[in-house]
Structures are given as C-alpha cells and as structure tokens.
C-alpha cells in the first residue's frame, strides 16, 4: 500500500522525488516516505528506524540537498574565510565522535540515499551541513582565538520569537510564534516542512533545511505536547570542542522530551556552546512556558503559567551577558534592542487577545520603533536588512546585506494537540526578493551571484502531521 501511495503522489506532484533508481533494493528504504509542495513549502513525511529516516530524507530531497551543498561552501568561504574542506574536517574530527549512535545511523542513511540518487556527497558533507549554525559562528571564532588571530566570524543574531500563556492569550492557552532571520542564500532554501515519525521517541512536526535532521531555526512541536523555538544570542563567544554537537542535542531534546525539565536537561548534557540560544519552550499539557537561556558557562531557566517570553537576540541573564558576550544592552538602536522594545510594546497592547491570527500579525510586524514608522529593516520584528543602509555590524552584515526574515510560523495549544502549524515562506512583511534586481543595485554583493535566488512572498499556509496533498 505504501508503494502505491508513493506512485500516486508522484503522478500528481511537480518534481516529486521518490522515483525508481537503478540498483534499488527490493525492501526499498524509501517506502513510507512521501512529499508534496504547497505555497513554497516542500512537505516531507519520514518514518521508521534511523537509517530509514535518513534514506527517505535524501531520497525525497536529493535535488534540494544537492542545491544547498552547491551554494553553502562558496558562501561560507566568502563570509568566514574557510573553505568547505575546513568544515568537512571539523565535522569528522570535532563533531562525529560525539554524535549518538542513533543519529549517526540517520546521517549515514542520508548519505546512502544520496548515493542511490547519484548525488556526490559523503558523510562529512552531511555532518558539516547539519552543523551549518554552530561551526561558522562558534567553532571558527573560538579557533581563531586559540590561534591568536582576530575572529573572522561572529555568532549570528537571527530571529524574532514569542511564547505566551494565561492572561496574555485569548483562550488562556499557549501561543507561540517565530520568524527566521538569516542570509538569503541559505534562507531562500529553508522551506521544508518535516513530519517525522521515528521508531523511538516522539513524533515531530518542524520546519527545516534539506539534509538537516533538526529544525535548526528552530520551530518544533512533538507528540508529547512540548513545543519549542529559539533566538540566538548576539555577540556570544564560546565553544567546547569536547562537547556534543548542538544540532544533535536540539533534535534529541525535541524527540525525547515530555516536559520542560527534560528539554533543558538534554540540551545541557554535553553542551558545547555551539549555536547558543534563548529557547522558548511550552508544555501544552500544563500550560507552562519557559525561557531557557543556554550559554556555555552559564544557563538559566525562567518559567510561568501566566505571562510571556520574547526573543530578538538579546541575552537575558546579566551574568551570561558579561561573561560570554560583547553585547551592548545600552545601544537602543541596534537590531536586538529595538526589536525587544517593539516586542514589549506589542505584548502590552495585545494582552488577553493573543491568538494565532494575532501571532501572524506580530511575526509580520514591520514597524521601526526608533524611526517610528513602518520598515521593514533591521530594527523591525519582520526584517529586511537588504533595505537598510546601516546593516547589522553585530552580525557582520554590511549595508544592504541580503538577509532578513525568510519565513515565519505560529502555533497555539489546540493546534499543538493535533500537531499543526501555520507557516509562511518569504517576507511576511514585504515584497518578493528578486536576486537579479538586488545585484544590479548593489554591486558590492556581486560575489553572491549564482548563490542568491529569488524568494517569493507566499501566503500563510496550514500543515499537520500525516497530511496528504490536497487535504
């Protein structure tokens, strides 16, 4: 029946991958997986043991993985002054030995699927791709410091997120929202909606990148009622090469958590400091929400059943800020602080009214609280730095850098029960990004020609687990 399902889907879906390949096994590991496309998203269902999850992942997304690998190496070489072989070597020497066997099997399953689809990539390509956040922005500056060099990269400061409960929401239950800020090279390809049904642990619904086993920006709900998202900590400095990769800990935390305490404990087990985040976590069964700030030396956990937490890339704990970042909390005009001020304003204005629709509006908010007018720019919750003559120096984003909000997601308690998400690709606050027009206006980014691609603004779109095309 599963084979028939895949065949039917392929007949009606543009660019549907699975398809027969030479030498495929009779017990095809791709069985059970399927994909369809909707409003810029590629919905992918994966199920089974780790190696099957990995094989299905690549078998269904081979073209997208090939394309992401094509652009990410040149992009990182320009922005971090390290070539792709550097990242492959770090994946092999620094990360692989600390990855749990379950996820090693899944990653190797992706590699096996790549071979079946004639994509030339190996284990170290895929591990490096999964570490696309923690290696460039955390390992690289740490290594520079160890070698007595000036840091060639900085930790990123991307995303705007909130979580609210109790008297702040319309139905007194949890509402959570997030929009992902990143460069448009990678961000325009951050368009996968994964329905992940592993052999062990909880089922997951999450957005993500092709070839990557964790949401990574992050927005996930699991079948135990745990929902989580995050924003990175601007100016963070620190990395422990003896720790476990963040991408593995984040995936494991969502797959095996049944409580907020579970989530924090898994993230702290073997913490390497990579991709240091302020995590916004909710327990749909209790209505409790938490802000878990996860640095390397410092961490804190704030929780409530009546209130909210917001994230826009500012450190919350003063001790962490002073010991592990160079963040300036007094610069009211920088991106993180301006967006924080706007968050506080919106949460006060919408107390008792926050629901999914309000969440969509807030994640699409383009107001610049400093200039007191609509943006979007680097200081609006939904941002377009390609429209800003200031850029974001804290993130090494120059004037008119091609980066900003690339997609957004919202969920509430009733949706979490059924494992549903509303999501929108592109700028929910602005027009399409047209690569050729941008490059014609900004010759300083000519190096990104062939890496940047158009990114169309798409409508908010509903997804749920087990969904089929047309449902």
What are these regions (language model features)?
Residues 1-5:
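Positively charged n-region of N-terminal signal peptides that target proteins for export
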Residues 14-15:
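C-terminal motif of bacterial Sec signal peptides marking the signal peptidase cleavage site
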Residues 21-159, 169-171, 185, 201-202, ...:
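C-terminus-biased signal that marks the final domain/tail of proteins
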Residues 164-166, 170-260, 265, 310-312:
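Active-site rim segments in enzyme catalytic domains, especially the processed small/beta chain
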């Amino acid at each position: 029946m599963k084979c028939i399902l895949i065949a039917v889907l392929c007949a009606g879906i543009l660019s549907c991958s699975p398809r027969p390949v030479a030498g495929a096994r009779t017990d095809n590991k791709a069985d059970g997986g399927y994909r369809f496309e909707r409003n810029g998203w590629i919905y992918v269902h994966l199920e089974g043991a780790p190696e099957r999850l990995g094989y299905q992942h690549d078998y269904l997304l081979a073209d997208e993985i090939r394309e992401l690998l094509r652009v990410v190496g040149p992009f990182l070489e320009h922005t971090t002054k390290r070539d792709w072989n550097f990242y492959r070597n770090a994946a092999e020497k620094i990360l692989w030995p600390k990855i749990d066997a379950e996820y090693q099997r899944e990653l190797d399953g992706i590699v096996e699927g790549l071979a079946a689809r004639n994509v030339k990539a190996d284990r170290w390509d895929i591990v490096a791709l999964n570490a696309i956040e923690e290696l460039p922005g955390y390992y690289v500056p740490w290594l520079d410091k160890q070698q007595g060099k000036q840091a060639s990269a900085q930790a990123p400061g991307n995303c705007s997120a909130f979580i609210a409960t109790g008297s702040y929401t319309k139905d007194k239950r949890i509402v959570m929202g997030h929009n992902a800020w990143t460069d448009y090279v990678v961000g325009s390809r951050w368009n996968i909606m994964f329905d992940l049904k592993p052999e062990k642990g909880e089922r997951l619904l999450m957005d993500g990148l092709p070839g990557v086993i964790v949401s990574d920006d992050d927005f996930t709900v699991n079948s135990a009622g745990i929902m989580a998202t995050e924003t990175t900590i601007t100016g963070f400095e620190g990395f422990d090469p003896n720790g476990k990769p963040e991408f593995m800990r984040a995936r494991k935390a969502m797959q095996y958590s049944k409580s907020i305490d579970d989530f924090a404990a898994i993230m702290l087990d073997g913490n390497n400091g990579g991709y240091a985040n302020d995590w916004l976590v909710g327990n749909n069964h209790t209505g409790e929400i938490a802000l878990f700030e996860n640095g390397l030396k410092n961490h804190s956990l704030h929780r409530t059943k009546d209130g909210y937490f917001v994230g826009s890339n500012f450190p919350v704990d003063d001790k962490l800020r002073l010991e592990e970042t160079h963040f300036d909390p007094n610069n009211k005009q920088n991106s993180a602080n301006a967006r924080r001020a706007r968050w506080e304003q919106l949460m006060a204005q919408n107390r008792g009214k926050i629901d999914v629709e309000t969440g969509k509006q807030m994640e699409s908010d383009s107001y610049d609280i400093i200039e007191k007018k609509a943006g979007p720019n680097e200081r609006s919750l939904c941002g377009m730095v390609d429209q800003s003559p200031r850029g974001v120096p804290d993130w090494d984003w120059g004037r008119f850098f091609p980066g900003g909000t690339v997609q957004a997601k919202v969920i509430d308690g009733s949706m979490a029960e059924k494992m549903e998400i509303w999501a929108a690709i592109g700028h929910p606050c602005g027009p399409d990004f047209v690569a050729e027009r941008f490059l014609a206006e900004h010759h300083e980014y000519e190096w990104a020609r062939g890496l940047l691609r158009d990114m169309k603004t798409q409508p908010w779109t509903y997804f749920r687990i087990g969904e089929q095309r047309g449902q």
